[in-house]
Design a protein with these regions (language model features):
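C-terminal motif of bacterial Sec signal peptides marking the signal peptidase cleavage site
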Residues: 16-20
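Positively charged n-region of N-terminal signal peptides that target proteins for export
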Residues: 1-11
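Hydrophobic alpha-helical membrane-insertion segments
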Residues: 11-12, 141
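Mature, Sec-exported extracytoplasmic domains of Gram-positive
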Residues: 22-154
Length: 154
C-alpha cells in the first residue's frame, strides 16, 4: 500500500513539474497597446482576420491570434508597421513568415525607389519567427519593440 501511495505522490509531482513547462500565454492585443504607449505609436489597427488576408495574404485558418497596426500617414508614426501573429501550428507559422516577408520586401522596394532615409530604417527591421509566433516590426524603434515582444513570449 505504501508503494502505491509513494508512486501516486511521485506521479503528481512529475505532472506538476511538467505543467509549468508549457509555452507562456501572451495576449498580443495587450502587448500591442503596451508598445503603442511605450513608443508613442499613432497607428490604425487592423481588426479582423479578413484584414490580415486583405493586407498580408494571411489565411484566417493560420491565425490563433494577432495584432497589427500601420502608422497614420499624417503622424510621426507614418513609417511604422507592426504585425504580431500567433499561428495555429508550425506549418502555419512558415506560411505567415512567407507572407510577411513578401510584405517586408514590398516595403523595402518602395523605399528603395523613393526614400533613401526611410530605406536605411527599413534595412534595420526584419521578419522573425519563434515557434508559432511570427512578427514584422518596421519603425524607428523596431529593435526595442522586438525586444519587448521577445521578452513577452519567453
Amino acid at each position: 500500500m505504501k508503494k502505491v501511495i509513494s508512486l501516486a505522490v511521485a506521479l503528481v509531482l512529475c505532472l506538476s513539474i511538467f505543467a509549468g513547462c508549457g509555452a507562456k500565454e501572451v495576449n498580443l492585443a495587450d502587448l500591442m497597446d503596451k508598445m503603442n504607449s511605450e513608443y508613442s505609436v499613432d497607428a490604425t489597427k487592423y481588426e479582423t482576420k479578413d484584414d490580415m488576408y486583405k493586407y498580408y495574404n494571411i489565411n484566417a485558418d493560420d491565425i490563433k491570434q494577432f495584432a497589427a497596426e500601420v502608422g497614420k500617414s499624417d503622424t510621426d508614426s507614418k513609417n511604422t508597421e507592426v504585425v504580431l501573429v500567433e499561428t495555429t501550428d508550425s506549418d502555419a507559422a512558415s506560411r505567415v513568415e512567407t507572407a510577411l516577408t513578401n510584405r517586408y520586401n514590398s516595403i523595402f522596394q518602395q523605399n528603395a525607389s523613393y526614400s533613401a532615409e526611410e530605406l536605411d530604417m527599413v534595412k534595420n527591421c526584419k521578419v522573425t519567427k519563434d515557434g508559432n509566433f511570427v512578427t514584422m516590426i518596421i519603425g524607428e524603434k523596431a529593435s526595442d519593440m522586438l525586444t519587448m515582444f521577445n521578452d513577452s513570449i519567453k
